[in-house]
């Protein structure tokens, strides 16, 4: 199975530029942020409710608790919310004040007011990547980028496994890219003296 493309910074900016030209730019940036900054899958993004993300006072929660029906593995899971993601979610709440006061409403909504299915999320990612001229990118690109970048920054693979919500370490390891440059940097870390 071919893995989803990891975006360069320039490619990510290109996609954001395409999104910014869309009517629902804040909503779509939020969808991308959930993937790129929390590693959420399309089904998890589609399953989020307003109350999963915002407290009763409207503040962004620092941990999301996903119910079993919202996850791939059908188990309750938690997602740590980074400051970058909190910032985007706060902007979303500010932009869609009335919507984000309804705790049971789907977090992301269509132009018709209903929530998204996982397939709709997949299709939106695909449409924005296509408009940005990116081949090989999918709704899973943000998740793969999230996990790969954590590995590149030296985060322990067990920590990445927990953040990915994978049962098996071998699943997490498939997400983490390596190349000759990374291998060379790794061996240069050794000092014996």
Regions found by a protein language model. Name each.
Residues 9-38, 42, 100:
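Basic, Lys/Arg- and aromatic-enriched nucleic-acid-binding interface segment
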Residues 70, 166, 170-189:
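Catalytic-site neighborhood detector that most strongly recognizes the C-terminal catalytic loop/helix
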Residues 2-6, 192-193:
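C-terminal secondary-structure termini that scaffold catalytic or DNA-interacting sites
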Residues 28, 135-153:
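Short basic/aromatic active-site micro-motif
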Residues 2, 70-90, 104-124:
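C-terminal catalytic core of Y-nucleophile DNA break-rejoin enzymes
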Residues 44-46, 137, 147, 155-166:
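Active-site-proximal segment of tyrosine recombinases
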Residues 47-76, 83-85:
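Conserved tyrosine-mediated DNA breakage-rejoining catalytic core shared by Y-recombinases
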Residues 47-54, 161-167, 176-177:
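A short, basic/aromatic helix-end/turn motif that makes direct DNA contacts
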């Amino acid at each position: 199975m071919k893995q989803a493309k990891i975006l360069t910074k320039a490619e990510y900016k290109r996609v954001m530029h395409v999104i910014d030209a869309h009517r629902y730019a804040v909503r779509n940036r939020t969808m991308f942020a959930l993937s790129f900054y929390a590693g959420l899958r399309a089904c998890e993004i589609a399953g989020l409710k307003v109350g999963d993300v915002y407290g009763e006072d409207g503040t962004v929660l620092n941990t999301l608790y996903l119910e079993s029906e919202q996850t791939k593995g059908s188990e309750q899971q938690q997602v740590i919310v980074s400051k970058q993601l909190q910032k985007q979610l706060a902007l979303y709440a500010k932009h869609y004040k009335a919507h984000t006061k309804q705790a049971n409403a789907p977090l992301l909504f269509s132009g018709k007011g209903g929530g998204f299915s996982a397939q709709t999320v997949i299709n939106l990612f695909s449409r924005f990547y296509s408009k940005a001229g990116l081949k090989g990118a999918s709704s899973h690109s943000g998740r793969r980028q999230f996990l790969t970048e954590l590995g590149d920054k030296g985060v322990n693979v067990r920590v990445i496994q927990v953040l990915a919500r994978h049962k098996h370490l071998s699943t997490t390891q498939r997400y983490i890219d390596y190349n000759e440059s990374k291998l060379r940097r790794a061996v240069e870390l050794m000092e014996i003296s």
